[in-house]
Amino acid sequence: MGRHHYADRTYTSFDPEALRDVVHQSRIEHRLLGAGDLEIRVRNRTGPRFAVGAGDYGCAVYAQGVLHPGALTISLAPMRRGEVFLNGRPLPPHALQVYAEGASIDYVTTHAACWHTVTVTREHLQAHAVGRLGRELAVPGAGCAQFEPDPALTRQVLEQIETGYRLASEPGTDAETLLCCDLALLDALTEALAHAPSTPEPRGARTRRRIMEVVESVARQGAQSAEIDAAALSRLCAASERLVEHAMRQGVGMPPKRWLTMARFNRVYVELADPGNTRSVTDTALHWGFNHLGRFASNYRAVFGESPSDTVARVRGEPRPRLTARVAATVA
């Protein structure tokens, strides 16, 4: 993964394109799920053996994508003000999720939250585990597995991650010091994963994921999703309306109608933020199924922190600063 490099970026308005690379060697799509503090801080540290990333989100967010095709990705979200769901499963604050190479991730936070990821090759992690424990770790060969170690072990992982960020941000830190920090993080990860067998999926998880996939496929239909009522969604999911509602609340923390509405709001935002867009705000809102324009404008401002016309003006005129590089340090 190259030399040691550290970057600390703060976004002061929602920029889904800039957020696509928040996890090392991954492409992650972002959608806002409600009103909140739009400031998003992203930190990334890469070294010769693995990469570490962190996102501090002040608002409810949905992030979906495919992770590094050639490495394991280990995620945790120890600090949050609401609920956090990963792949339709609630994530306890002390839990770790291990994703196999190229696995898909669906991340939902219902309020402000901070997540961390460690990207490391399977070979390097297992070699370290054999050297430390005398055996390999039971990590998944495909998909994702959730581990729930003692909270003290999770705190040690988090402390080593934060120590690495602090050292990488200091100009005088040399490469040898960072390598020692990397080894300490691998030690902490190995201990946490070794002493926490993966937890089985809760009852009904497969049905819940299937329903979530159907609802998300409807959301991706765009404007047509505005015409889908609860009965139609129930038929598409081949499940009762009550089960569809329950599955969405258990898997993403909100009912299906709100999920579909927020997906359409995000599509409007992406279109208005496109410099090549030629449709008016009114035509764009109507196209995406928002017929009550006053209510639409009010809700849009609450979610994105600006009016629809402000979005258009910002894109067509001089864009206001959306990215602030707080720290960027490279150590040979």
Language model features: what each stretch is:
Residues 66-82, 118:
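Short, conserved beta-strand element in jelly-roll/cupin
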Residues 35-67:
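Conserved short histidine dyad/triad with adjacent acidic residue
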Residues 56-61, 77-82, 99-103:
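Short acidic (Asp/Glu) patches
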Residues 244, 248, 295-296, 300:
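Short hydrophobic/aromatic patch on the recognition helix
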Residues 211-215, 260-265:
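Generic hydrophobic, amphipathic alpha-helix propensity
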Residues 269:
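C-terminal catalytic core of tyrosine-transesterase DNA break-rejoin enzymes
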Residues 67, 208, 261:
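Short, conserved glycine- and acidic-residue-centered signature motifs
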